[in-house]
Design a protein with these regions (language model features):
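Rhodanese-like catalytic fold shared by cysteine-dependent sulfurtransferases
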Residues: 2-12, 19-54, 58-101
Length: 101
């Protein structure tokens, strides 16, 4: 995934964790919409509903629930970041820090 981010070919990456979790470190280029606000903010996700979207949270539960919301909103290609943020950190992969975009 990091290679695709660096090459500019990554799909939309959606972080559904809290604001403080996102600010502490997130996948570079991720869009931040906290899970509990997703139903009201799903229209903020740019691109056609047919485009792929990769969702993650800290360990998985919020991301899986977000996937249900996204599919109900018409997103057809929802996948999950393997291992979510926990595995990303354990692997020592580069993180961006700071507020939501």
């Amino acid at each position: 995934m990091l290679a695709r981010i660096d090459a500019g070919t990554a799909p939309t990456i959606l972080d559904v964790r809290s604001r403080w979790e996102f600010a502490a470190g997130h996948v570079p280029g991720a869009v931040h919409i906290p899970f509990w606000t997703l139903p009201a903010r799903v229209t903020e996700i740019s691109g056609p509903r047919a485009d792929p979207i990769v969702v993650y949270c800290g360990h998985g539960p919020r991301a899986y629930a977000a996937g249900i919301v996204l599919r109900a909103a018409g997103f057809r290609h929802v996948t999950y970041l393997e291992g979510h943020m926990q595995k990303w950190r354990q692997a020592g992969l580069r993180q961006a820090v700071g507020g939501s975009r």
